[in-house]
Amino acid sequence: MAFFKSAVFLVCVVLAAAGSASRSKRALVGGWKTQDPTNPKFENLAHYAVSTQVEGREYYDTVLELLEVQTQIVAGVNYKLKFTTTQSTCKIETGVEYSKELCQPKTNKVEAVCTSIIYTVPWQNIKRVLSYHCDAPNDV
C-alpha cells in the first residue's frame, strides 16, 4: 500500500511539473504579447493615434513605418505600438479629418519615433489613446 501511495504521489508531481513547464512557454495572462507589425489592423490603429495629436501642430503627422506591436488582454485590449512619423500634407483645420489615404507624407524623412498605447473594447465600440510619446529618431 505504501508503494502505491508513493507511486501516485510521484505521478502527481510529474504531471504538475509538466503542466507548469507548458504554462511557462505561453504568454503570461495579462502580460504583453508581441504581434506581427505587418497586420493592417495595427497600422490603422497607429494612424488613429496620430490623428488624435493636434495640439500645437499646424499639420497632422502621419505614420511612415510600424516598428513594433504588442497586445495586452485586459477588460478589452491594449495595443502598444511603436512607429515612425513625419509631417503630412494635411493642415489641421476645423472640420478637416485625418485620413491615411489623403494625409500623405510631405517627405519620407523620419521626424520622430513614437510609442502609443491604445485601449479598445470592440463589443462596446470604445477606442481611446491612453498614451502617446515621441522621441527624435536619433534619441531612440
Swiss-Prot record:
Induction: Up-regulated following blood feeding. Belongs to the cystatin family. Residues 1-18 form the signal peptide. Keywords: Disulfide bond, Protease inhibitor, Secreted, Signal, Thiol protease inhibitor. The keyword Disulfide bond applies. It is found in: Secreted. Coiled coil: none annotated. One of its GO terms (molecular function) is cysteine-type endopeptidase inhibitor activity. GO terms for cellular component: cytoplasm; extracellular space; vesicle. Expressed in midgut (at protein level). Inhibitor of cysteine proteinases. Inhibits several endogenous midgut digestive cysteine proteases, such as cathepsin L1, L3, B and C, but not aspartic protease cathepsin D1 and cysteine protease legumain. Inhibits proteolysis of blood proteins catalyzed by tick gut cysteine cathepsins. Inhibits host cathepsin B (CSTB), C (CTSC), H (CTSH), K (CTSK), L (CTSL) and S (CTSS). Gene3D superfamilies: 3.10.450.10. The keyword Iron does not apply. Decreases symptoms in mouse model of mannan-induced psoriasis-like inflammation by modulating immune responses. PANTHER family: CYSTATIN. Disulfide bonds join 90-103, 114-134. InterPro entries: Cystatin_dom, Cystatin_sf. It comes from Ixodes ricinus (Common tick). This is Mialostatin.
